[in-house]
């Protein structure tokens, strides 16, 4: 039998309880966006811009401003977060630094006005009104169901973690100095109006956050006001600053961000070590020792550089001919830290298998495909040097919504299964998404076929038709 990566409840496969069904609709929702699928959601989010146009002309290239005069969309945006929400959330135990920051831009520098310990709404409101401070609320999708719904769809669409922050800024004030981020940014204006100024990047597609002094950024490439219902996108590295104009009401905007450390360079760093390890098993040249005292050289000798270049060409040639799934810590990290499937409620209820137990003549189909990754790697349970490769299936069905995007200091668990490498073809049959009869799975025995189906069913990864 395959083994679980992490125990996830009762392992008695013959017993079942009603499955906790994921709900796709919020009751009495104001939503004017299309949540039918990740693709339809993103299409409705950037409407009237076509998706093809967005990725061809704007994504990672230049900002996109979408200004709308749509009262229903403006009302929906306003429903996503408000100052009254902040009052109710403070009663749940918010802390400075972890959940909220209070800050103001003074003389081109960020001044943090946080207190210690728990955040009280009256103190936050006092700083907001009297000190004209911006209140930054971290990762509101932990508390607001509709933001969970939005970001879960976006994580499915991009295949990358999606975070968010809410910024509440009083009139005549600015929270942050000019800076650029290491993420792709979508701005949704929820309440009031905000003046945005964007500048050409000094570091295109930046990998780090950085504050830029006013004398370095030049003149704005864009200067405009956002109003409720408007959407702004800009690539990582875009220098920006935003302020609420004097004489107007306060402003609230939502920042949705994605694609942090999600470049080709990151993927290469993630996959190259496994590739070298595999090829070194077959190529004795990679197992020969380095020249004596090479690590003691101040500079790398030319012959060593040529040797390394030759090894890299060998790796490239070997990579092109490989069809095997590459082990990837990026895959594991994504599924481990992303949001669970959206459902109404607090999101902490575990999902349990329900319905018919799959048998040899049953027809099964994969579910929650966007929440599952399949990868091949060495068996971590083997301590000997000759580790056998196994297939790992990781999923996010039992992830904790409350810890989403809260940093590495929060302990997270990884859920899933591991199977012998001989199961990979049968798993690919199921992963295509079409219904498949259990007895038609590409495995050697009927017992293996049924065990595979039951194991996936126990984790709610397949259902019986």
From Swiss-Prot:
Fe cation binds at residues 179, 181, 240. One of its GO terms (molecular function) is peptidyl-histidine dioxygenase activity. Its EC number is 1.14.11.79. GO terms for cellular component: cytosol; nucleolus; nucleoplasm; nucleus; transcription regulator complex. Binds 1 Fe(2+) ion per subunit. Its main location: nucleus. It is an enzyme of class 1 (oxidoreductase). Its cofactor is Fe(2+). It is found in: Nucleus; Nucleus, Nucleolus. Keywords: Dioxygenase, Iron, Metal-binding, Nucleus, Oxidoreductase, Phosphoprotein, Ribosome biogenesis, Transcription, Transcription regulation. Residues 139-271 form the JmjC domain. PROSITE patterns: JMJC. GO terms for biological process: ribosome biogenesis. It catalyses: L-histidyl-[ribosomal protein uL15] + 2-oxoglutarate + O2 = (3S)-3-hydroxy-L-histidyl-[ribosomal protein uL15] + succinate + CO2; L-histidyl-[protein] + 2-oxoglutarate + O2 = (3S)-3-hydroxy-L-histidyl-[protein] + succinate + CO2. Belongs to the ROX family. MINA53 subfamily. Oxygenase that can act as both a histone lysine demethylase and a ribosomal histidine hydroxylase. Is involved in the demethylation of trimethylated 'Lys-9' on histone H3 (H3K9me3), leading to an increase in ribosomal RNA expression. Also catalyzes the hydroxylation of 60S ribosomal protein L27a on 'His-39'. May play an important role in cell growth and survival. May be involved in ribosome biogenesis, most likely during the assembly process of pre-ribosomal particles. This is Ribosomal oxygenase 2.
């Amino acid at each position: 039998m395959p083994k679980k990566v992490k125990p996830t409840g009762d392992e008695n496969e013959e017993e079942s309880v009603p499955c906790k069904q994921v709900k796709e609709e919020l009751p009495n929702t104001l939503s004017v966006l299309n949540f039918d699928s990740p693709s339809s959601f993103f299409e409705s989010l950037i409407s009237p811009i076509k998706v093809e146009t967005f990725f061809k002309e704007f994504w990672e290239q230049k900002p996109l401003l979408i200004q709308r005069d749509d009262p229903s969309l403006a009302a929906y945006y306003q429903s996503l977060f408000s100052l009254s929400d902040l009052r109710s959330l403070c009663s749940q135990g918010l802390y400075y630094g972890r959940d909220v920051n209070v800050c103001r831009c003074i003389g081109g520098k960020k001044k943090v006005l946080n207190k210690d310990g728990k955040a009280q709404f009256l103190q936050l409101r006092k700083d907001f009104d009297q000190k004209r401070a911006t209140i930054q609320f971290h990762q509101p999708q932990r508390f607001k169901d509709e933001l969970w719904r939005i970001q879960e769809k976006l994580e499915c669409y991009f295949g990358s973690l999606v975070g968010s922050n809410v910024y509440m800024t009083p009139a005549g004030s600015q929270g942050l100095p000019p800076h650029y981020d290491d993420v792709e940014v979508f701005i949704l204006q929820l309440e009031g109006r905000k003046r945005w100024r964007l500048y050409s990047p000094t570091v295109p597609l930046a990998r780090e956050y950085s504050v830029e002094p006013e004398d370095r950024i030049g003149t704005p490439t864009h200067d405009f006001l956002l109003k409720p219902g408007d959407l702004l996108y800009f690539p990582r590295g875009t220098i920006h600053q935003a302020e609420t104009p004097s004489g107007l009401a306060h402003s609230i905007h939502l920042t949705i961000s994605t694609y942090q450390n999600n470049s080709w360079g990151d993927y290469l760093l993630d996959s190259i070590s496994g590739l070298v390890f595999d090829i070194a098993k077959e190529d004795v040249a990679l197992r020969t020792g380095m020249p004596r005292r090479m690590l003691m050289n101040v500079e790398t000798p030319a012959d060593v550089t040529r040797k390394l270049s030759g090894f890299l060409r060998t790796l490239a040639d070997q990579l092109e001919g490989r069809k095997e799934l590459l082990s990837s810590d990026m895959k594991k990290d994504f599924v481990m830290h992303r949001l669970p499937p959206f459902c109404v409620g607090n999101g902490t209820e575990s999902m349990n298998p329900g319905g018919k137990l799959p048998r040899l003549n049953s027809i099964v189909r994969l579910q929650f495909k966007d929440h599952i990754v399949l990868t091949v790697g060495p068996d971590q349970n083997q301590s000997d040097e000759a580790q056998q490769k196994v297939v790992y299936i990781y999923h996010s069905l039992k992830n904790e919504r409350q810890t989403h995007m809260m940093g590495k200091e929060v302990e997270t668990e990884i859920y899933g299964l591991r199977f012998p490498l001989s199961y990979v073809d049968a798993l690919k049959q199921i992963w295509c998404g079409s219904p498949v009869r259990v007895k038609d799975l590409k495995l050697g025995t009927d017992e293996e076929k049924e065990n595979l189906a039951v194991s996936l069913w126990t984790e709610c990864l397949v259902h019986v038709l």
